[in-house]
């Protein structure tokens, strides 16, 4: 009798995706982040669902409903901080996952990569809208500043902003619709992640060498299921440590003050995972230019496959490209630091130089270096 795992219509999909899937024998722990992102998404959906049971999306009661969750709901504080810090873990895994893709040339799987870029945008939109929901000072002013950026779009800008607000300022209508979108988007993300996996399994995984691994495949289970479980345990260890010891480490104290449209906080800044893009936005004096740079800072990922000039896929055997990759990482860390600093000397010029370097590295320096490496190998 044939195994039910291979014949049942539902089971065989799971089987071919997580059990009998032929996987390269040499993929390192950098390939763990896909499963970790899946775990993060599940944690966020579950904690978010329980938070939504007690949250009210009304400007008068939103802040106090979050306080009520933390004070009166059984383990409400735990659910709330798991959700808030779970978002940070989500983005750490996302950045490492994208970094892995850039380093090892995984972007050569075009459909998988482009859906990944779309997923990144969707997760960023979800996180932004989620940050507005507690209706603290930074929630309100963050929503005001970021939505206002759309007014830079010629001709339709101001109408578009008022349409998104549902009025003439960020108010009850804005909060209600942000809650609705924040609730639905994770399910769209889950569906997109399924499509992301579907396209990945059409080609099979890449591996650190960037060479074909068809000659040497091993089954996903038990080898990579065990390996992924180790990653999940480490993720849970870091997340619970963060939640139980310093839950507000990555948050902003201003968000513990209820939203007040008449009082602007001294430094309006987003959550830490948006700071690099925020620094790029602020480094351009022109409003429309800043908005374009902000969008391009993420959208540039979609153009990476077009900028691949090397004859090799991975950076494993390309020392010059490796150096540039780590300079890019350092540049992004610098931008993240600058995004959290006030707009004054010397931070302005550092931010502008780091922003220029970011685009120069990706668009010019790395492709030229790849051509140079081809010549060194007489290719």
Curated annotation (Swiss-Prot):
Gene3D superfamilies linked to this entry: Cytochrome Bc1 Complex, Chain C
Main location: mitochondrion
Keyword Isomerase found: no
GO molecular function, one term: metal ion binding
GO cellular component terms attached to this protein's record: mitochondrial inner membrane; respiratory chain complex III
Protein family: Belongs to the cytochrome b family.
Function according to Swiss-Prot or TrEMBL: Component of the ubiquinol-cytochrome c reductase complex (complex III or cytochrome b-c1 complex) that is part of the mitochondrial respiratory chain. The b-c1 complex mediates electron transfer from ubiquinol to cytochrome c. Contributes to the generation of a proton gradient across the mitochondrial membrane that is then used for ATP synthesis.
Subcellular location: Mitochondrion inner membrane
Protein name as catalogued: Cytochrome b
Cofactor: binding comment: Binds 2 heme b groups non-covalently.
Note, other: Heme 1 (or BL or b562) is low-potential and absorbs at about 562 nm, and heme 2 (or BH or b566) is high-potential and absorbs at about 566 nm.
The species this protein was found in: Parablarinella griselda (Indochinese short-tailed shrew)
